[in-house]
Amino acid sequence: MERARRLAYRGIVKRLVNETKRHRNGESSLLPTTTVTPSRYVSSVSSFLHRRRDVSGSAFTTSGRNQHQTRSISVDALKPSDTFPRRHNSATPDEQAQMANYCGFDNLNTLIDSTVPKSIRLDSMKFSGIFDEGLTESQMIEHMSDLASKNKVFKSFIGMGYYNTHVPPVILRNIMENPAWYTQYTPYQAEISQGRLESLLNYQTVITDLTGLPMSNASLLDEGTAAAEAMAMCNNILKGKKKTFVIASNCHPQTIDVCKTRADGFDLKVVTVDIKDVDYSSGDVCGVLVQYPGTEGEVLDYGEFVKNAHANGVKVVMATDLLALTMLKPPGEFGADIVVGSGQRFGVPMGYGGPHAAFLATSQEYKRMMPGRIIGVSVDSSGKQALRMAMQTREQHIRRDKATSNICTAQALLANMTAMYAVYHGPEGLKSIAQRVHGLAGVFALGLKKLGTAQVQDLPFFDTVKVTCSDATAIFDVAAKKEINLRLVDSNTITVAFDETTTLDDVDKLFEVFASGKPVQFTAESLAPEFNNAIPSSLTRESPYLTHPIFNMYHTEHELLRYIHKLQNKDLSLCHSMIPLGSCTMKLNATTEMMPVTWPSFTNMHPFAPVEQAQGYQEMFTNLGELLCTITGFDSFSLQPNAGAAGEYAGLMVIRAYHMSRGDHHRNVCIIPVSAHGTNPASAAMCGMKIVAVGTDAKGNINIEELRNAAEANKDNLAALMVTYPSTHGVYEEGIDEICNIIHENGGQVYMDGANMNAQVGLTSPGFIGADVCHLNLHKTFCIPHGGGGPGMGPIGVKQHLAPFLPSHPVIPTGGIPEPEQTSPLGTISAAPWGSALILPISYTYIAMMGSGGLTDASKIAILNANYMAKRLESHYPVLFRGVNGTVAHEFIIDLRGFKNTAGIEPEDVAKRLMDYGFHGPTMSWPVPGTLMIEPTESESKAELDRFCDALISIREEISQIEKGNADPNNNVLKGAPHPPSLLMADTWKKPYSREYAAFPAPWLRSSKFWPTTGRVDNVYGDRNLVCTLQPANEEQAAAAVSA
């Protein structure tokens, strides 16, 4: 292995030296180049000298022969200097030419012409108005400030699952605004993800402790969809034998509607009744959902209710409130089977509906039926505790249509914020907040009774007071004039929900609202001593929670700051290096894009506030919808789906609703290529569709004749085709327009998965190709950061004939943007009207700053970067699929299958070794087992592309040493990877290679290296010994003592 190290060093250094000479001599080269220095970091001087961008000549012109004569300045030199595309698209014009030449093309455009089929190529893409040229960064900030000023943030007492909260500044600045947290990917590579894995384990512990159930996932999209997932679990637990699901009318209306929509695909009947009228006599009820506390504030004792349900073979789902559970008897102690809810009020802003981390907790008995990611405890190669994602065989990327859910990663960033909020406040701090909120609600209720102008509900409550009066609308209007939002339930009923941000002064203002013009003879402060706890002792929590030291140590800002950074330092993010995951598009999340996300005028808006108070948001939605229509060639967009998986489901439900409207109830067959993302068949199954798989040919294209035969065989029942373009194999299929025609000729609709939209924007479009509906992953193509596993957004675009069926909402009606002439919405997809509205400014600013030209260039450079890397690697690794002219799209697959026989090396070994080089591995063994799929994106510099290629080439040399017999097949630098400091600095070293080579296999690592913090994690051990919460301190100490 020492020889491998020397050869790798020699090759890299030789190339760098030769390139330096060529730069000095002013030579152009077709050879791959990197920066002038072997370090990945380039000085500002050399950067200016060697990477000048967008400069075609001098800014000045000379009017005479000598330098002393007058010079005039060009108009171009006076234009704004803070244009954005040159900051996002990393390759300079010179580098673009170099890389295109290296790939065998005269220039970038000839490469693109040879890659994108002419039959689907757009002449150009053009936006209307100011967005076509693209706003500068300063103009964009000014524009967003103007939009923010149009949002009128009233004091909210609406509740309904959304509450104002104080986001601790230490969490806001160091997690929500910190790219080291928000640019991470889902923690598939556990060894370089231990920080967020620990934080997500903390989250799961918060959920299990507060709900009283032993298992929780690491987040779901929102409370409404979490309830729908629980409904599906009840159906699965009883193996589909009972087809009725009962929802108590005390649940939030958005939750009821989301469940009703989801039930259609499972052929479930949803019955909504008053809780006292729940009836199981039909014998067909699989589950029942109740709210605790209820949507109108009531706190009920569910003890006998749960016993009765279980006696009738019915599973009980409770939707709950985490803050309330610090005071209320936990659902697990009632015997609830599944508990769902949102962690929003634990330090996550409302953000006009999201993103927020929801949760689902259940018993060990149902753990394999749970949806979503679950973090578990395992051990690493040294026997030390390490964390990983557990039980992945349940998930869609493995089980496809047999998966527990189509959900992928959900809301990891927000789950981390929720967990840190609990860590910061601890059990006593959380209880103090809850008692204060309850006390303010109680003082308000007491004051209303003294006023005598309205009646207060007599049932116990936590934070929400139900008020009945003669004219609720008049009170609602009076409150609005004082910039206060109440919940208007009906003409005689109002609810008032209190939260962490409510003050005694706010309560006094409420007294004035309800006093009907009469003077108020008391204050909230004067009434406070008279209020007694409104929660009966039978419903008061007695069991302890959050007893682990982590929740009892970090209560000062300094301590929490250090804990956050301790975890952050364990995780690789885009702050460190490129993350070349195929089909994931880990591109730049620019600072200007991220700034508005934490502005109070965007963060503090309740999703059910009257739309006239949210005109800034509404204007942005309209602009964004129209821009996305231009980009995709569609006629209308829905912004409601709050994840890519949610977008897939929504798009297929639109197709289903369309067929239903035409009387084609029998159309339920969905054709899906075997190479499709796992979410595709899982989403189709959720819509009640029958899946017909079609294969691919040797070149990675859909087998068109097989597709034609499948479509014709199912023409009477064909609902849809799901297709990804470019294909998941990383090529532009020449026959895509023919594929669309085949489906349409046989009565189906074409659903395009937008995962690879980064290779379409400005060059072609789903609508132009022939698709009828497509979801966009805004967290891929349009720059929303991945957040370590969420948030994301999956809005759907449709052709005109499908626009009437776009989803709406029971509280704030919504539809397509632009709005179609007629509407017949399919139902409700997510809990909030516009999904995770708070992160939409990210995509909006990206599109607006790039302009049509910048976006088109981004697609071109993404394709160029992929082809350049494929060319550099092709003599070391087989590139599996190419288009008709020998090029790839924006991603490509390298084949490692042969190494299993020649050296005993698997893709996992290569991915783990890349960690020692400071990189996250590409996508492993998908869509083809035994391969790696690489996607560089347009925002990675040529120097970074070269560095990654150098790492893979060096690893190939390491493999060759095994093949030649110079390294042990079972004990080598790849099988031993990654190499954390704890291993390298141990007293003993028994490896047949040196510590130095294990740690520093490439020259750039000497100046800057990201260190994995654990050895290779044992996946099998973790699933066989499943632990998904923090262990009690004494067990941890015992484990540490044993491993030592």
Swiss-Prot record:
Ligase among keywords: no
Principal subcellular localization: mitochondrion
Residues found modified as N6-(pyridoxal phosphate)lysine: 780
GO CC annotation, single: chloroplast
Tissue-wise expression: Expressed in leaves. Detected in roots, stems, flowers and siliques.
EC number(s) given by UniProt: 1.4.4.2
Keywords: Mitochondrion, Oxidoreductase, Pyridoxal phosphate, Transit peptide
Function of the molecule: The glycine decarboxylase (GDC) or glycine cleavage system catalyzes the degradation of glycine. The P protein binds the alpha-amino group of glycine through its pyridoxal phosphate cofactor; CO(2) is released and the remaining methylamine moiety is then transferred to the lipoamide cofactor of the H protein.
Transit peptide start-stop: 1-72
GO BP field: glycine catabolic process
Alphabetical list of PANTHER family matching this protein: GLYCINE DEHYDROGENASE (DECARBOXYLATING), MITOCHONDRIAL, GLYCINE DEHYDROGENASE, DECARBOXYLATING
InterPro entries the UniProt entry points to: GcvP (IPR003437), GDC-P_C (IPR049316), GDC-P_N (IPR049315), GDC_P (IPR020581), PyrdxlP-dep_Trfase (IPR015424), PyrdxlP-dep_Trfase_major (IPR015421), PyrdxlP-dep_Trfase_small (IPR015422)
Family, similarity comment: Belongs to the GcvP family.
Reaction equation(s) it catalyzes: N(6)-[(R)-lipoyl]-L-lysyl-[glycine-cleavage complex H protein] + glycine + H(+) = N(6)-[(R)-S(8)-aminomethyldihydrolipoyl]-L-lysyl-[glycine-cleavage complex H protein] + CO2
Protein name: Glycine dehydrogenase (decarboxylating) 2, mitochondrial
Record Pfam families: GcvP2_C, GDC-P
Deletion phenotype: No visible phenotype; due to the redundancy with GLDP1. Gldp1 and gldp2 double mutants have a seedling development arrested at the cotyledon stage even under nonphotorespiratory conditions.
Gene: GLDP2
Cofactor(s) needed: pyridoxal 5'-phosphate
Subunit structure, interactors included: Homodimer. The glycine cleavage system is composed of four proteins: P, T, L and H.
SUPFAM superfamilies in the record: PLP-dependent transferases (SSF53383)
Keyword Ribonucleoprotein: no
GO molecular function: ATP binding; glycine dehydrogenase (decarboxylating) activity; mRNA binding
Subcellular location: Mitochondrion
Gene3D superfamilies from the UniProt entry: Aspartate Aminotransferase, domain 1, Type I PLP-dependent aspartate aminotransferase-like (Major domain)
